[in-house]
Swiss-Prot record:
Protein's name in the database: Phosphocarrier protein NPr
One cellular-component annotation, GO: cytoplasm
HPr domain segment(s): 3-91
Primary location: cytoplasm
Assigned protein family: Belongs to the HPr family.
Function per UniProt: Component of the phosphoenolpyruvate-dependent nitrogen-metabolic phosphotransferase system (nitrogen-metabolic PTS), that seems to be involved in regulating nitrogen metabolism. The phosphoryl group from phosphoenolpyruvate (PEP) is transferred to the phosphoryl carrier protein NPr by enzyme I-Ntr. Phospho-NPr then transfers it to EIIA-Ntr. Could function in the transcriptional regulation of sigma-54 dependent operons in conjunction with the NPr (PtsO) and EIIA-Ntr (PtsN) proteins.
Swiss-Prot/TrEMBL keywords: Cytoplasm, Phosphotransferase system
Record's keyword annotation contains Signal: no
GO biological process: phosphoenolpyruvate-dependent sugar phosphotransferase system
Active-site residues, Swiss-Prot/TrEMBL: H17
Length: 92
């Protein structure tokens, strides 16, 4: 099964902080897919680890690459990218 990936811009003011990471992990775990997030500096974490995502230190204005593999990879990738593009549903 091919791996899909997409680059997305972190737009929310606080970046990929704890609350945003929890939302991303919960969403990622709802799909039958393995998702990874790669920061601009090349560090990578699986999307099922809040601590791993926090260690990426992805801030507002930085791009991250989301990769997905598995039977629901396309849906998972689309949903996670949409969550990030919608600023993790946070009010600014």
């Amino acid at each position: 099964m091919p791996q899909l990936s997409q680059t997305v811009l972190i737009q929310n003011r606080l970046g990929l902080h704890a609350r945003a990471a929890v939302k991303l992990v919960q969403l990622a775990q709802s799909f039958d897919a393995v998702l990874t997030v790669q920061s601009q500096d090349g560090r990578e974490a699986t999307a099922d680890s809040v601590m791993g995502l926090l260690m990426l230190e992805s801030a507002q204005g930085q791009n991250v690459v989301i990769s997905a593999e598995g039977s629901q990879a396309e849906q998972a990738l689309q949903a996670v990218c949409q969550l990030i593009e919608q600023k993790f549903d946070e009010d600014e």
